[in-house]
UniProtKB/Swiss-Prot annotation:
The lineage of its organism: Eukaryota, Metazoa, Chordata, Craniata, Vertebrata. SUPFAM superfamilies: WD40 repeat-like. It comes from Xenopus laevis (African clawed frog). This is Mitotic checkpoint protein BUB3. The gene is bub3. GO terms for biological process: cell division; chromosome segregation; meiotic cell cycle; mitotic spindle assembly checkpoint signaling. WD repeats lie at residues 8-49, 52-89, 91-130, 133-169, 220-268.
């Protein structure tokens, strides 16, 4: 397996048959680190067998795919610029178009506690889908284009354009539980909920991350904070990079961030410190995913056209075995 290591050491390798264009999302199967789902601007969704380093299957959309999610080990859901939400049976390799949005679908997540698929779109709505039928189970207006969303137990945290954050209760979508403004000054790039369900992490295009808490009480809100990251001093000038990706370690509640500087950092939010930084990757980190057991981190290094169409390294997915020393609060 380590023949693919190329400069990365024995705890990391590169996946074969990577997508042919930008990588939009990497997601591990809910109960194993064996399978990884990857969506891409090449209009494909790919399923990889990670330990074997092989692509198991690939299915197509009519346009670039912006996000994907596992519903269960044998069903993938995905959406993108073709506005269509697809469910794909990974056993039979069969497609179902479940429904659509009026604009590109930016986010696809599964909520196990309520058993719904959630999609967020640039059409300024969130839609819920019943995966059993499968069919639409409701459409809910948001204040602006949906850029990111994350499921926390039975709650849904939505980040939109205009730096807005909304907290919804997936069991009762009749009204918004909380309306917030991002505590960061610049556009929201990614929101991910803490596995312990107490809060979320929000990253922006301007090299910053905020750690936020859901409980609105003053006592709890005092604990929130933000910090700078993914900034590099070059010739005495500070270069500031977008923080594109956040992924939580399910057991430790620590999290990884990936930026357009090509670095991945792991943070301890409780002691407010960085636990480690990996080597620099060849280009921007577009997406990150810890496996459910926290043993493995998938890292998508994929140019995000921050500087328009310049020559850039080919898109790649690195699979890294992580240790407690790198991920456990100290």
């Amino acid at each position: 397996m380590n023949t693919q290591t190329d400069m990365t050491g024995s705890n990391e390798f590169k996946l074969n048959q990577a997508p042919e264009d930008g990588i939009s999302a990497v997601k591990f199967s809910p109960n194993t680190s064996q399978f990884l789902l990857v969506s891409s601007w090449d209009s494909s969704v790919r399923l990889y067998d990670v330990p074997a380093n092989t692509m198991r299957l690939k299915y197509q959309h009519a346009g670039p795919v912006l996000d994907c999610a596992f519903y269960d080990p044998t069903h993938a859901w995905s959406g993108g610029l073709d506005h269509q939400l697809k469910m794909h049976d990974l056993n039979t390799d069969g497609d179902t178009v479940v429904g659509s949005h009026d604009a590109p679908i930016r986010c696809v997540e599964y909520c196990p506690e309520v058993n719904v698929i959630v999609t967020g779109s640039w059409d300024q709505t969130v839609k819920l889908w019943d995966p059993r039928t499968p069919c639409n189970a409701g459409t809910f207006s948001q204040p602006d284009k949906v850029y990111t969303l994350s499921v926390s137990g039975d709650r849904l945290i939505v980040g939109t354009a205009g730096r807005r954050v909304l907290v919804w209760d997936l069991r009762n979508m009749g009204y918004v539980q909380q309306r917030r403004e991002s505590s960061l000054k610049y556009q929201t790039r990614c929101i991910r909920a803490f596995p312990n369900k107490q809060g979320y992490v929000l990253s922006s295009i301007e090299g910053r991350v905020a750690v936020e808490y859901l409980d609105p009480s003053l006592e709890v809100q005092k604990k929130k904070y933000a910090f700078k990251c993914h900034r590099l001093k070059e010739n005495n000038i500070e270069q500031i990079y977008p923080v594109n990706a956040v992924s939580f370690h399910n057991l430790h509640n620590t999290f990884a961030t990936g930026g357009s500087d090509g670095f991945v950092n792991i943070w301890d939010p409780f002691n407010k410190k960085r636990l480690c930084q990996f080597h620099r990757y060849p280009t921007s980190i577009a997406s990150l995913a810890f496996s459910n057991d926290g043993s493995t981190l998938a890292i998508a290094a994929s140019y995000m056209y921050e500087m328009d169409d310049i020559d850039h390294p080919e898109d790649a997915i690195y699979i890294r075995q992580v240790t407690d020393a790198e991920t456990k609060p100290k």
